[in-house]
Amino acid sequence: MRKFLLLIALLAVGIAHADDRKLLTMEDAILNLELTPKNYDIRFSKKDPAIYEHANGDVIEQYDILSGELVSSKPILIGMPNPFRNKASMKENNVVWHDAEGKEYKVTDFADKNIVCGQAVSRHEFGISGGLFPSPDKAFVAFYQKDETKVTTFPLLDITTRTGSLVEIKYPMNGMASEVVKVGVYNVAAQSVVYLNVTDFDEERYLTNLTWSPDSRTIYVQVLNRAQKEMHLNAYCAKSGAFVKTILTEQNSRWVEPQNPLHFIDNDRFIYTTDNRDGYKNLYLHTLSKGTTERLTKVAADVAYVAHTEEAVYYYSSEISPVEQHLFSLSLSDGKMRQLTRGEGWHNCQISPDGKYFADNYSSLNVPRVVAVGSTDGKFYREVFRAEDPSKDFNYSTIELGSVKSADGKYNNHYRLIKPLDFDENKKYPVILYVYGGPHSQMVRNSFQAQLRRWEMYMAQRGYVVFVMDNRGTLYQGAEYEKAIHRQCGKAEMEDQMAGMKWLLSHKWADSERVGVHGWSYGGFMTISLMTHYPEVFKVGVAGGPVIDWKWYEVMYGERYMETETTNPEGFAATSLIAQAKNLKGKLLICQGAIDDVVVWQHSLSFVDACIVAGVPVDYFPYPRTQHNVRGKWRVHLMQKVTDYFEDYLR
């Protein structure tokens, strides 16, 4: 019956839209890459910074930046260089070195699989993306080494084997034993390894943001205690591994989170990023010989380093708006700042090697993509590419951007709102809140279609109001905004989301009797939190890969925001959803990948068990072969499942 009614509804919609523009299919919403704006990649020439290059098919085109004239067009030559010459690489759990002839030398030789060398550590927190760090002169290679002997294992079920089998992963749970990390340094000429003599804090410290000095003599490491409340920026001798000195320290009663390496201007000066001193992520200039740290970017906004020369530093800033990113320059001699990007929106830029030019790739709500080049003195700016709207053949609803005051009245939380096709303010429509809300995120930007997930438009085309809003705890509104969640994940986030829902439901066209919520990961945690704390508001929810109790989440992320059950028992009790299962009133579907190695299966299965104990009905759908994120054809199946659930119970 439901499918028959849906068919009738779709036929009616098709008649109503006789302009021949299409509706999204589920495959369009999930898999159609043609609905992403075309890109126009450019890069600055290494030989002549006044030239930019663009790959056009099988040729490289070179253009004069100022005139825009084509200077040359040459075939792309695909060489076959040996990738393993004069470099280190990983081999199983060890590091090896390949000399100029390609001969392989063992740097480490551990048979114990609990000791892993040359890979990222700390589960990729603190901006860590790799484990090998060659020195500028290539005479040394620093590398991470982690000992996971004491870390507990978690079993994942592999159904592809004949009788099923277990795959055990190392998973350091909150409050339990963590990995022990060291930094080794391989001396290429001597073919020897030394380890940095790190003695700060206990052995479960974090070693983050390794940076080489320009002269390759010193390694700088931002050493963080396990509680993540104190950081020491230390210098170590590359040859001996000996501790040299502590350059600076940071302390915070909530958390310190070093995420950025140092950027050296010369051997004596470097640029340093922190949000721990002035309430926002800002850039600072430290002079080693003087022991001084000077604030460079003096704005009440979060900034991010892009590049520098000896004369200037280039950075992104959110000072125009938290939902926009613009490129600025700052003179290192007189401190003068200049905005370089033009046009509203979200800008991603690169700087020429000599610092005279920049390339700008940006979009805004109704602008799919623009690529431009400009001069850093502000005198020149020229557009070189403008993309067409890839969705022009589809019947899209208008996307609205706006803001609602946070529950504490101090901030503007930004939202995107999508109303149904042929919207009539005198009708009532079901509402879906799509939520994430967790740290390091921003769901709403003034970029093309406001970072729309096409499934949202798919649902709007089928008669739903879709609402997405960022809350306290997310990015680009300063340290206080981001750290409001400390020791109580979910509290400030829910308060803000409810402030947004109060505003939304004040409109007569929003049906307060038909409100649903959907989210994944932290958004799954938020979905179940909202369903159980505000059952009178949310009638239907779909939660994916949800955190249920922070004691089952990983050490690095979980302890930063929640600390441990020992130090924060009240916070863990208040945020655990096990005790909230009895409050579930509406229809809830939980989906999760059965081999999820981020939010392990223990979370969602434990919540289902709590619902059984409480006598509360709940629906559950596992994806046996998927990890934390469900992709490809499995994602099409997932989002159809989500859609059907709302169609069945919220329509």
Segments and roles (model prediction):
Residues D20-K38, A190-V198:
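A short helix->beta-strand "capping" segment at the edge of beta-propeller domains
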Residues N32, G68, V107-L132, F143-L196, ...:
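Predominantly five- to eight-bladed beta-propeller fold
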Residues N39-F44, P49-Q62, L70-G79, A142-K146, ...:
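Non-catalytic accessory segments flanking enzyme active sites
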Residues I65-G68, D99-G102, N187-Q191, A238-G241, ...:
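Short loop/turn segments that connect beta-strands within beta-propeller blades
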Residues K146-T153, T161-T293:
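Beta-propeller domains
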Residues T153, N348-R651:
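Serine-hydrolase catalytic core recognition
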